[in-house]
Amino acid sequence: MTDTSPRTEPADWATDQEVRWCPGCGDYSILTAMRMLMPELDVDRENTVFISGIGCAARFPYYMNTYGMHGIHGRAPAIATGLAMARPDLDIWVIGGDGDMMSIGGNHLIHALRRNVNIKILLFNNMIYGLTKGQFSPTSEVGKVTKSSPMGSLDSPFNPISVALGAEASFVARTHDMDRQHMMDMFRRAHEHKGAAIVEVFQNCNVFNDGAWEGITKKQNRDANLITLEHGQPIRFGADDEFGVVVDGGAAKVVSVADVGVDALLVHDEHKPDPSTAFMLSRLARGPFEPTPIGVFRATERIEYASSSTSQLAMAHDNQGSGDLAALLRSRGTWQV
């Protein structure tokens, strides 16, 4: 009889490092979900890498018994890109918060996504700067009163899902820290995807922005405001599936199913090459108090970056032969500048 049990246990993926997040932080549940998922993926710790930037979320590599790098602010996607190019055999995860990824790291993030580098990005979004003690972040709502905006923030927030879709990311998903199984499902889907995958995680900072997502994630609010996307299914939600989503006038809108009928509802297609419909879904909610989709927004196939680069180098080698650096240095060609 074949033994199909996992080769590792969740405890094998834990380290001896003391976890230094605040008690009650949503990061704990994300860490637990990841540790529980790893044995199910049946991957080797020696071939798994977690790379982070700066911030509360960035301590994640210390707590996973794998290779890892605690990088510099915003640069985790760039570091991960280099590693993915040099070692395409590795499982590479990138961890960062909304401040780290959407502010100083914004350019690195969108270029890693558009290039389709084979890395898996988890963006912990708590709509606040936590490590620096409570300033408004690029995802904070307009009017947010913080230490750095005592009269309220004037900045319109980024929507990470919209940004990712605008960068033509081939895999885009969203989950939240109150549902461990859903987190594991989204992380698993990201891992299975060949190319750049980003998962936004609604995460609670109970010290500096407590309850930011409770309008969506709190148990008594989920029926009214949490829309779970399922490929091939009409988009419905509510305690009795009494609400649905339609496309009207170029925008996604919430309707009563009794008013329009089931046949009028938008059927979710995560494999649709054009990201327009997924983008409309990402704009459905104007803030963390309205019906908000979670799940996989987009999962399309295109060649990942390292494969493209390898093919290009092979073509150059076939057409021009192997390079000779020593011969180049000894050549008589000179340039004046």
Language model: regions and residue ranges:
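Flexible, low-complexity linker and terminal segments
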Residues: 1-7, 16-17, 207-337
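Active-site diphosphate/adenylate-binding microenvironment
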Residues: 7, 11-72
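Conserved thiamine diphosphate
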Residues: 9, 89, 137-190
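Short coil/turn connectors at secondary-structure junctions
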Residues: 17, 44-48, 76, 86-92, ...
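Thiamine diphosphate
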Residues: 52-130, 184
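Glycine-rich beta-alpha junction loops
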Residues: 54-56, 126-128, 179, 202-207, ...
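Active-site-proximal loop->helix
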Residues: 106-113, 131-144, 163
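ATP/pyrophosphate-binding catalytic subdomain of soluble kinases
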Residues: 170-226
